[in-house]
Amino acid sequence: MIGVVDYGLGNLFSLENALRFLGADFRRVSRPEDLSCFDKLILPGVGAFPRAVAALRETGMFEALKRAEQPLFGICLGFQLLFTSGEEFSLTEGLDLIPGRVVRLEGPVKIPHIGWNSLHLCRPEHPLLEGVREGDFVYYVHSYRAVTAPEFELAVSDYGQTVCGLAGKGRVSGSQFHPEKSGDVGLTLLKNFLEKRF
């Protein structure tokens, strides 16, 4: 059973449609005490880093996610929350499950970064990337990017700067792009998360 973390800031409709298409057994989870009922967790999110952290703290989900032992996959803002800190509006502590910080995209490119971009696979052997090819396109919507060590970067995109598109450390991974909006490539990645062992 997959738990989709619902803390009031995720647009869950597209993600749930993708999970349904893949035949996944899932339900939303909003109480920290229920996390242990699930085999794997997905942390979506749309909006601002500080507001998301505040929402997770208010429900007790922040500390619960830090303690959780299941595989966890973050998407977009949920991906950014996996890192040590975020610099949106003010410096805010993240979940610190993957070392790194979240910083604003730099010009002269258009911000936010909206649209399709190609992937360079840093670790093509990683289970999440099985069936994903060098140069495959995925769909981004974001104004901030994660800066992390190369050892945690699974795939990156070029947008006038390196954008960490996919990162992972142990049981924790996530994507800055939206796999649920990235066609067959995104579905492949989600399927890998559902089926592979981490």
Task: List where the protein language model places each region.
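Short acidic low-complexity segments
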Residues: M1, F26-C37
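N-terminal beta1-alpha1 ligand-phosphate binding loop
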Residues: I2-A24, F177-K181
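Short amphipathic alpha-helical segments
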Residues: E16-N17, V53-L56, T84-E87, F152-E153, ...
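Short acidic/histidine-rich motifs immediately flanking catalytic phosphotransfer sites
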Residues: L35-G45
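Cysteine-nucleophile active-site neighborhood
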Residues: G47-G115
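Pocket-forming structural segment of enzyme catalytic cores
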Residues: T84-Q161
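Short, surface-exposed beta-strand/loop micro-motifs that present aromatic residues
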Residues: Q161-K169
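Acyltransferase
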Residues: S175-F198
